[in-house]
């Protein structure tokens, strides 16, 4: 089944959304679906989603990612077009997958900085998940988009929220500083609400582009994974997100339901959700 993309709405008066779905060719039970919704801000949608199954060197890879941009769309759009290709171009991807992903993240960030004249001063978070032959899941992330696995109905976070407060020591050792004003979140150099990101050339020397990488075996206890931008996690915790979608067998409907719930809870940010069901 080919990946299907559509432009839809979440209902009367709701922002327009991008949605899509697809399924594995080697395991008919493994399916993905995604949904997005623009937030309340006046700027264009800055979340970008990548979701597809791809046959590579006789293996099947499920490639899933959410790129949550800031300042402009150019960096997340570049990541959508290039990050997975850069990962798969690493010569030792199959033998040392975690190291290959780390190198590809750094290479991609270096390239973004080199292309500053074209891509501008913006940046992006990222959470990527690579499903290898429906058996092994490798998750990497920069920033605060999140990956959460449901295992026997219990939420397990497979990413790290890279918040300025928790990485204050590293930021200060690089010559930066963290501000925390009343009514606002902590920010690097008074600007960025995450401590790790792609791009952001103006404050790059105070940020990190080193991803956290986690590996998970997909067995009978692993039910589904949620990838979502921070528009979800600002209004619900991991277990609430799992509980919201666990009874919805259609992955695309599950992603849409999670966004609907976030909107009910007054999330004002751009929201993107991918759900991958394993059985």
State the predicted function of each range.
Residues 1-279:
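PP2C/PPM-type serine/threonine phosphatase catalytic domain
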């Amino acid at each position: 089944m080919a990946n299907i993309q559509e432009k839809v709405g979440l209902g009367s008066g709701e922002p327009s959304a991008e949605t899509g779905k697809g399924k594995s060719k080697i395991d008919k039970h493994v399916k993905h679906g995604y949904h997005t919704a623009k937030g309340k801000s006046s700027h264009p949608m800055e979340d970008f989603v990548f979701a597809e199954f791809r046959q590579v060197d006789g293996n099947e890879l499920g490639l899933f990612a959410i790129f949550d941009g800031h300042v402009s769309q150019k960096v997340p759009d570049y990541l959508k077009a290039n990050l997975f290709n850069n990962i798969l171009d690493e010569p030792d991807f199959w033998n040392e997958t975690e190291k290959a992903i780390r190198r590809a993240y750094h290479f991609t960030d270096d390239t973004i900085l080199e292309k500053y004249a074209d891509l501008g001063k913006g940046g992006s978070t990222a959470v990527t998940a690579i499903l290898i032959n429906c058996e092994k899941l490798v998750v990497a992330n920069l920033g605060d988009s999140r990956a959460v696995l449901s295992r026997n109905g219990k939420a397990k976070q497979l990413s790290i929220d890279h918040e300025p407060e928790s990485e204050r020591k590293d930021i200060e050792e690089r010559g930066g500083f963290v501000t925390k004003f009343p009514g606002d979140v902590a920010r690097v150099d008074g600007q960025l609400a995450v401590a790790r990101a792609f791009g952001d050339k103006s404050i790059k020397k105070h940020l990190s582009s080193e991803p956290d990488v986690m590996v998970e075996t997909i067995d009978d206890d692993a039910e589904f994974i949620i990838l979502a931008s921070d528009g979800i996690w600002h209004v619900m915790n991991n277990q609430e997100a799992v509980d919201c979608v666990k009874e919805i067998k259609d992955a695309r409907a599950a992603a849409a339901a999670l966004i609907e719930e976030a909107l009910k809870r007054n999330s004002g940010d751009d929201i993107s959700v991918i759900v991958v069901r394993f059985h």
